[in-house]
Regions:
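Glycine/tyrosine- and acidic-biased, solvent-exposed loop/turn segments at the edges of beta-strands
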Residues: 1-127
Length: 127
């Protein structure tokens, strides 16, 4: 979400909390000179954590985690310069690993492993 800025207002700086229309917290994080920076947290309408990770000069940077509505982990991964980089993992709704592999400059690279809902390796693919 980009904050609305108009006219000659100075860029946002400091801690910012954004809310859904129902008043529930939507996100919390810091701005520096109008750009997202540091750790941000995003929430679902039910109040549970949806995602958390770091920004650097308005770009995704470093490790991120996403969660399902029930609180279970959905996926984890790392960003560099706003692009997916390094090891990424996604999980089935039951918490078992769904797939894992690496990204290089925002694209799948090398061997990726895919698992069934019981956690058993079902296939592998090279990218």
């Amino acid at each position: 979400m980009k904050p609305k800025q108009s006219g000659n207002q100075p860029p946002k700086t400091g801690l910012v909390k954004e809310y859904f229309r129902n008043g529930q917290l939507c996100s919390v994080g810091k701005y520096r000179d109008g750009k997202k920076t540091g750790i941000w947290k995003y929430y679902l309408r039910n109040g549970k954590l949806k995602a958390t990770g770091k920004y650097s000069k308005d770009e995704l940077a470093g490790p991120w985690k996403w969660f399902r509505e029930n609180g279970n982990l959905l996926q984890t991964g790392t960003f560099k310069n706003g692009k997916q980089e390094g090891l990424w993992k996604r999980y089935h709704p039951n918490g078992e690993l769904y797939d894992e592999g690496r990204y290089l400059d925002g694209k799948k690279a090398g061997l990726w492993k895919y698992y069934d809902a019981k956690g058993k390796l079902s296939r592998m693919k090279n990218y």
